């Protein structure tokens, strides 16, 4: 039995996906993809599923996601799901399809929040006092 493990990251959210042979079920934190709320999040998570089409009919994917907020978790989950589908099927045309549609389906976003600097630490990383000329 073939099993594939992949990881997707976005800011502080980390999604770990496990793909194995099955009947096309996708579960996120043990909850079916169809029951995800709000609708915007569900639609974004359906993108790799719609693009994959029939390639997903014999794959079960279980995703555990932790950390971050709801949108970061969604992005991390999309990346983990896209990577799992491509790695499990091994089809280059599917990989090209994902990359041409949206690169973040296969590549994690490396950006992180900038650390606050000393002195005006509570105000943010680049806060300066406003200068007055009069």
Swiss-Prot record:
The gene is rps9. One of its GO terms (molecular function) is RNA binding. Keywords: Ribonucleoprotein, Ribosomal protein. Transmembrane segments: none annotated. Residues 118-134 have a biased composition (Basic residues). The keyword Ribonucleoprotein applies. It comes from the Archaea. One of its GO terms (biological process) is maturation of SSU-rRNA from tricistronic rRNA transcript (SSU-rRNA, 5.8S rRNA, LSU-rRNA). Residues 109-134 are annotated as: Disordered. One of its GO terms (cellular component) is cytosolic small ribosomal subunit. Belongs to the universal ribosomal protein uS9 family. InterPro entries: Ribosomal_Su5_D2-typ_SF, Ribosomal_uS9, Ribosomal_uS9_archaeal, Ribosomal_uS9_CS, Ribsml_uS5_D2-typ_fold_subgr. NCBIfam families: PRK00474.1, uS9_arch. HAMAP family: Ribosomal_uS9_A. This is Small ribosomal subunit protein uS9.
């Amino acid at each position: 039995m073939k099993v594939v493990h992949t990881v997707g990251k976005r800011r502080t959210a980390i999604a770990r996906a496990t793909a194995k042979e099955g009947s096309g079920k996708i579960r996120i934190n043990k909850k079916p993809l169809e029951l995800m709320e709000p609708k915007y999040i569900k639609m974004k998570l359906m993108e790799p599923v719609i693009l994959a089409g029939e390639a997903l009919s014999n794959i079960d994917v279980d995703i555990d996601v932790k950390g971050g907020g709801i949108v970061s978790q969604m992005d991390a989950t999309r990346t983990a799901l896209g990577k799992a589908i491509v790695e499990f099927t091994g089809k280059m045309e599917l990989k090209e399809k994902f990359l041409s549609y949206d690169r973040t389906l296969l590549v994690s976003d490396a950006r992180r929040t900038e650390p606050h600097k000393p002195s005006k630490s509570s105000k943010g990383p680049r806060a300066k006092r406003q200068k007055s000329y009069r």
